[in-house]
Swiss-Prot record:
Keywords: Cytoplasm. The keyword Cytoplasm applies. Transmembrane segments: none annotated. This is UPF0291 protein Sez_0489.
Amino acid sequence: MDPKKIARINELAKKKKTVGLTGPEKVEQAKLREEYIEGYRRSVRHHIEGIKIVDEDGNDVTPEKLRQVQREKGLHGRSLDDPES
């Protein structure tokens, strides 16, 4: 997210605590917060999709649901053509 938008979120939060927000400012704050949260969720999802879990013996123990997502995206050498990947 653009640093200017984050600064605006913080500015509106501070103003809300001190003098309150106008109607349009409340709408702007809600929109900016939703945009921030959506970006954060995308980032977390991207990181989780890139994780491969192995046990002490080196066996892949990645949960099947995550493996399926990785197959669809071709991550970690996984392929939809190879259900064992």
